[in-house]
């Protein structure tokens, strides 16, 4: 990790050189092979530019911008600087967590930190860019109700979803729905009365991330998945996620403010480890347990914001 930060050029050269760096990490060249394969999932296992662009740059940029606006509203000086620094620190921790066995710097880490993470912070500090994504593309980040297990400290029900509701010309009651993460869902959003939106998408997600211990090259196994979301004016009320991913067959989240003013709940079903249930509160820690051989008490990682009903 330190080599990637302090010796980025050397890390790129050790990972195959500049050609591999541009071809696999930045440019969407793999899309051509995917199309030629008639959209075979196996040909999409190394399109690292996709999570780099949507996850690191756009999602990271939106997160930084939102944090900056929150800090600014609270009168914190140098809000953009603090928000950008916090976002980059989180990106470094994420790289350390996802690459625990690597002993040398990699071109992938260099790309994510210096090109996409930093680029997203800078890009979304521009008001015109932030306004375009918020008001034209209707981009938002919807998160699961992340929880910590006690006493193991395991992180459970943790996921961020970058979603878009893209306008359809001459259609006022529906939009094109796009959910991006490591995988992707494409579908439609139906605009209901009272500011409610119902979004349905289908696509694929990653079952397992494979990292070459020498080069740091990342590939993934792709599995089918689908999702359903209910929100009101962008505030997520409930979500349902189904997939063939072993560790996340079914996930249900009902957020605080949907059925109860302060409490929310979630359910996670896995292929081999039974299921887990959790309870959250918008302003205080809660707990949960599951009647299975792998049941543990769960505590929300942070208070959930109140959903606007």
Where are these regions (language model features)?
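Membrane-interfacial alpha-helical segments at the cytosolic side of multi-pass membrane proteins
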Residues: 58-74, 114-130, 286-290
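Transmembrane beta-strand segments that form the barrel wall of outer-membrane beta-barrel proteins
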Residues: 176, 262-268
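Long, repeat-rich segments with strong aromatic
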Residues: 167-254
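Extended amphipathic alpha-helical segments with heptad-repeat/coiled-coil character used for oligomerization
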Residues: 109-159
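Transmembrane beta-barrel domains of Gram-negative outer membranes and organellar outer membranes
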Residues: 1-74, 214-216, 222-236, 244-248
């Amino acid at each position: 990790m330190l080599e990637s930060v302090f010796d980025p050029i050397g890390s790129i050269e050790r990972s195959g050189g500049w050609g591999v760096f541009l071809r696999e990490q930045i440019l969407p060249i793999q899309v051509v092979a995917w199309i030629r394969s008639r959209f075979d999932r196996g040909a999409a296992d190394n399109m690292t530019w996709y999570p780099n662009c949507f996850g690191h740059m756009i999602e990271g940029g939106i997160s930084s911008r939102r944090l900056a606006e929150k800090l600014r509203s609270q009168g914190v000086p140098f809000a953009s600087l603090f928000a950008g620094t916090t976002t980059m620190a989180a990106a470094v921790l994420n790289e350390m967590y996802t690459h625990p066995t690597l002993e040398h710097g990699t071109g992938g880490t260099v790309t994510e930190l210096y090109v996409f993470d930093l680029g997203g912070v800078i890009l979304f500090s521009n008001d015109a860019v932030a306004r375009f994504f918020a008001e034209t593309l209707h981009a938002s980040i919807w998160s699961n109700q992340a929880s910590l297990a006690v006493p193991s400290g395991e992180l459970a029900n943790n996921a961020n979803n970058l979603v878009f509701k893209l306008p359809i010309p001459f259609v006022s009651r529906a939009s094109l729905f796009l959910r991006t993460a490591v995988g992707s869902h494409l579908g439609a959003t139906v605009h209901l009365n009272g500011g409610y939106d119902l979004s349905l998408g289908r696509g694929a997600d990653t079952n397992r991330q494979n990292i070459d211990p020498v080069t740091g090259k990342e590939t993934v196994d792709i599995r089918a998945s689908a999702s359903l979301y209910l929100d009101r004016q962008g505030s997520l009320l409930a979500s349902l996620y189904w997939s063939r991913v072993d560790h996340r067959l079914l996930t249900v989240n009902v957020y605080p403010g949907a059925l109860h003013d302060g409490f929310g709940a979630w359910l996670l079903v896995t292929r081999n480890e039974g299921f887990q249930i959790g309870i959250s509160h918008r302003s205080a820690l809660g707990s949960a347990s599951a009647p299975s051989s792998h049941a543990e008490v769960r505590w929300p990682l942070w208070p959930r914001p109140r959903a606007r009903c």
